[in-house]
Each structure stands twice: as structure tokens, then as C-alpha cells.
From Swiss-Prot:
Belongs to the DarP family. Keywords: Cytoplasm, Ribosome biogenesis, RNA-binding, rRNA-binding. Residues 1-20 are annotated as: Disordered. This is Dual-action ribosomal maturation protein DarP. HAMAP family: DarP. GO terms for cellular component: cytosol. It comes from Pectobacterium carotovorum subsp. carotovorum (strain PC1). InterPro entries: DarP, DarP_sf. Coiled coil: none annotated. CDD domains: YjgA-like. It is found in: Cytoplasm. Member of a network of 50S ribosomal subunit biogenesis factors which assembles along the 30S-50S interface, preventing incorrect 23S rRNA structures from forming. Promotes peptidyl transferase center (PTC) maturation.
Length: 183
């Protein structure tokens, strides 16, 4: 017994007829691959983090265990473990993890910028001498003028005698301590 075309249409349940009105969003295979690769890269970033930084990232127990295992594995096993971490991330919302990583990277960038600023201050102190000390005291009012001037004089003597820059390092450490106590 053959069914006619009209009979096939009559056999369709009512709720499936309404599905034709719903918009279907097609995602290309390439886009799916790009997203999977991005999540695998996110997993690789997690694996490259240190233990303290990893504790600041909101991860569930399974994902944290997989990341810690990947940190211990070498060679080909590591690649497979990274793929597993990427797969685990696809099943989760990666947004909070990415946000936490961005915050960590931003904090690192701020610290690098501060170190560059302190290096420039140190170099100015060594080159220009006591003329820069009032500028330092304006930035860091609790700085010890006498200690700073002593370190600057020693650094200038070391530079003139082509000795290792021990006092220059001490100036940088002192400026870093001042910056940390100011914050």
C-alpha cells in the first residue's frame, strides 16, 4: 500500500509544523574548530600558570586536577592532556576563567610598568644626583633623604670606577619598597 504525498504531510505531528517558523542558526565547521582551538589555547594558558596564580582562577575540581596533571606531564602526553582540557572547557562556561586570567595578566602588566618607572627614577637619580631627590620626596614623602643621597653617591662612585652596580640595585630595591608602602 503506497502512501501519497498528502498522506505524509498528514502524518507530521502538530508540534513539528511550528518548528519551520523558528530560525535555525547555522555555525560553520571552521567556526566550531576555531572556538575549540581558542579553548585549547585557554587551557594551555592555565597549564602555564604557576601554583599561586592557578589558585586565583575559578576552576571546578575536575578541571583543576586535569590542569595540575598537565603541568606534571611532558611531551606527547601533555598535548593529549591539553586536548582533554579544551574538551572540558567546551562543556563549561569559559568566561569567568578568561576574566580571571585577564585580571592576572593586567596585574602583571601594571607591575612591569611600575618597575620601568622605578628604573627610570633610579637612572635619573644616578645621572642627575641630588637635583632629583626633591622629586622623589614629593612622590614618596616618607622616604629617607639621607639614605637616598648616600645610595646615590655610592652608585655614582661605582659607575665612575666601572664597578658592579651594587648601589644602583639597592636604590631600585629602596624605591620599590617605597612604592609598595605607598600603595
Amino acid at each position: 500500500m503506497k502512501q501519497k504525498y498528502e498522506d505524509w504531510l498528514n502524518d507530521v505531528p502538530d508540534n513539528q509544523e511550528d518548528d519551520e517558523d523558528d530560525e535555525i542558526i547555522w555555525v560553520s565547521k571552521s567556526e566550531i574548530k576555531r572556538d575549540a582551538e581558542a579553548l585549547k589555547d585557554l587551557g594551555a594558558e592555565l597549564v602555564d600558570l604557576g601554583k599561586n596564580a592557578l589558585e586565583k582562577i575559578p576552576l571546578d575540581d575536575d578541571l583543576r586536577a586535569a590542569v595540575e596533571l598537565a603541568q606534571r606531564i611532558k611531551k606527547e602526553g601533555r598535548r593529549r592532556q591539553l586536548q582533554l582540557i579544551g574538551k572540558m572547557l567546551r562543556a563549561r562556561d569559559p568566561e569567568p576563567i578568561q576574566t580571571a586570567l585577564d585580571k592576572l595578566n593586567n596585574r602583571h602588566n601594571q607591575q612591569v610598568a611600575l618597575f620601568h618607572k622605578l628604573e627610570q627614577l633610579r637612572d635619573r637619580l644616578i645621572e642627575e644626583g641630588d637635583d632629583v631627590v626633591p622629586d622623589i620626596l614629593a612622590l614618596y614623602p616618607h622616604a629617607d633623604r639621607q639614605q637616598l643621597r648616600s645610595l646615590v653617591r655610592n652608585a655614582q662612585k661605582e659607575k665612575a670606577a666601572n664597578k658592579p652596580p651594587k648601589s644602583a640595585r639597592q636604590i631600585f630595591q629602596y624605591l620599590r619598597e617605597l612604592a609598595e608602602t605607598t600603595d
